[in-house]
A protein has these predicted regions:
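Sequence-specific dsDNA recognition surfaces
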Residues: 1-22
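Short, ligand-facing micro-motifs at secondary-structure edges
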Residues: 1-3, 22-48, 53, 63, ...
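Hydrophobic residues in beta-strands and at strand termini
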Residues: 4-6, 40, 57, 100-102
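A short glycine-rich beta-alpha junction/loop motif
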Residues: 45-52, 83-109
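Short, solvent-exposed alpha-helical surface patches in well-structured domains
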Residues: 64-67, 77, 97, 107-111, ...
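Amphipathic alpha-helical coiled-coil/heptad-repeat segments
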Residues: 102-155
Length: 155
């Protein structure tokens, strides 16, 4: 939902996600989506939906937790423990069985800053490559069109 009426927003403080909060989905319709999460780095008001947990803490670096929860090590521990037919749920029991690394706060911040920098560079490279691929796909389509319509002679 992109718009929430003011009346609902007035009573939705418990669902309000603030800058620096970490949101974690406790259910998924597929195994790959188990443990999806996001770190809110914007100042825009965001409201969490049903089957989400907002983690607000100053004792841990929420950005570090978001990176940790996106790691294959953590997600594989979740995926091997969830069960379900149509919906997979992550219970408190499952969470208590998962082993995670929680270094001191200073190290958490150092790790998240390092990952921000490296991931940003990788994202930029991916975006550049996607533009190149889109250009090559257009070039290919243009070539095919020009050849089959006779604008380019092949003999």
């Amino acid at each position: 939902i992109r718009f929430i009426p003011r009346e609902l927003a007035k009573n939705g403080d418990s669902a309000l996600v603030k800058q620096g909060d970490f949101i974690f989905a406790d259910t998924s319709e597929d195994l790959e989506g188990c443990g999806n999460c996001v770190y809110n780095d914007t100042t825009n008001p965001i409201y969490a939906g049903y089957h989400t947990i907002i983690y607000k803490t100053r004792e841990r670096d929420c950005k570090y937790l978001a990176y940790l929860f996106r790691s294959n090590v953590w997600r594989s521990q979740i995926r091997c423990r969830v069960s379900g037919i149509k919906v997979y749920s992550i219970t408190q029991g499952i969470m208590s069985q998962v082993n995670i690394l929680l270094p001191p706060m200073s190290e958490q911040k150092e790790i998240s800053t390092y990952l921000d920098t490296k991931c940003s560079k990788i994202d930029h490279i991916i975006a550049t490559q996607k533009k190149k691929i889109a250009y090559l796909q257009e070039l290919k389509q243009s070539l095919i069109t020009n050849v089959v319509t006779g604008k380019i002679k092949v003999s």
